[in-house]
Amino acid sequence: MALTYKKAGVDISKIKQSQKAIGKLITSTHKLQKKAKIAHGFGHYAGIVEIPGGKMLATHTDGVGTKVVISNLMKKYNTIGIDCVAMNVNDIICIGATPISFVDYIAANKNDVPKFKKIVEGLVTGAKKSAMPIVGGETAIMPDVIEGEGFAYDLAGMVVGLVEKKDLVLGNKIKTGDVIIGANSTGIHSNGYSLARKALLKKYSIKDKIKGVGVIGDALLKPTEIYTNPVLEMVQKCKINGLAHITGGAFTKLLRLKNTGYQIDSLPKIPPIMELIQEQGVKMKKCIRHSIWE
C-alpha cells in the first residue's frame, strides 16, 4: 500500500480548513491602521502594505518544519539556519521585493550554547547570501512545550522587504503564451520531511550510505537554495509576469498566481534522494504534490 502524507500524520485537507478559518479572522484586521493601506494580504507569498512615501512594505514568516528532526538525528546544526532564511526570502522575492531585514525565533527544550551558535551560523550564512541584515530574534527555552530526548528545537523567522509599487509582481498579468522558466533545487529543500522520514527510516538508518545518494542524512540536510540575487536581477532586467516558489503544493503553486492552465514539457532530472523515496512506496504524484521534489 502506497505511503501518503496523510498516513505520515499530515492531513492537507484539514490544514486547508484551518487556513480558511484563520484567513477570515486575519482579514478582519486589515483596516485597523490608517497609515498603511493593505495592497495584498492573506494568501499570497507576502503581505503587502503601502507605506508613506509610496513604497510597498512586504512581510513574510516561515520555518523549516520537521527538517529539524534530521538535524538532530545527524547532530548537525550549522546549515539549518540557511534553510530558515531561504524559506523566507524565496517567498518574499516572488512579489519582486528586496529583503531588507530578518528576525529569527528559536524554541528549544533546554539551553545549549554550542548548538545555538551553530544554528545562528547558518542564519548568518543565509543572510550574507541574501545581502540582508539580521536585526533581532528570540530564543525561548520551553521544556514543557518542546519535548524530546536530549536537545529538541524548532526554528522559524520573519523577513521584511521593500518594493516600488510599479515593480510589484503579483501574477495578475500572466497570460496565454507566457514561458515558464524553472530553477534547479539542491534537493528536497524544506518541505515533505514528515513523509520522507516515514518512507526512508522504516528501512534505512539516517547514516546509511546509498549508491548515487550518499549518506541519507546528508542528502536530506542539503540546504535550501537561496534565489534572491538571480531572481531580483531577472526582475530588474526582464518583464516578469509571475513568480512562484515551489514548496508545499509543488507545481500547483502556479495556479495560485492566476487560474491559467499551463504545460510543463521539460522537467529536470529526478534527484537521487527522491528516487530512493519512491522506491519505498511513495508515488511520483505524492512526491511532486508535497514538494519532496522541487
Residue map of PLM features:
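N-terminal glycine-rich phosphate/pyrophosphate-binding loops that anchor nucleotide-derived ligands
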Residues: A2-C94, A131-M132, M142-V145, K175, ...
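Glycine-/charge-enriched secondary-structure boundary and capping motifs
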Residues: A2-G9, K115-P133, I146-L155, K203-L221, ...
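Active-site phosphate-binding and catalytic loops of NTP-dependent enzymes
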Residues: S28-K35, K166, M284-C287
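Glycine-rich anion-binding loops of enzyme active sites
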Residues: G43, M56, V64-G65, K75, ...
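Glycine/charged-rich beta-loop-alpha catalytic/anionic-binding loops adjacent to active sites
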Residues: G63-K76, D104, K211-V215, G281-M284
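Alpha-helix C-terminal capping segments
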Residues: N90-T98, R256-L257
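Acidic, glycine-rich loop-and-beta core segments that form the ion-binding/anion-interacting portion
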Residues: T176-D218
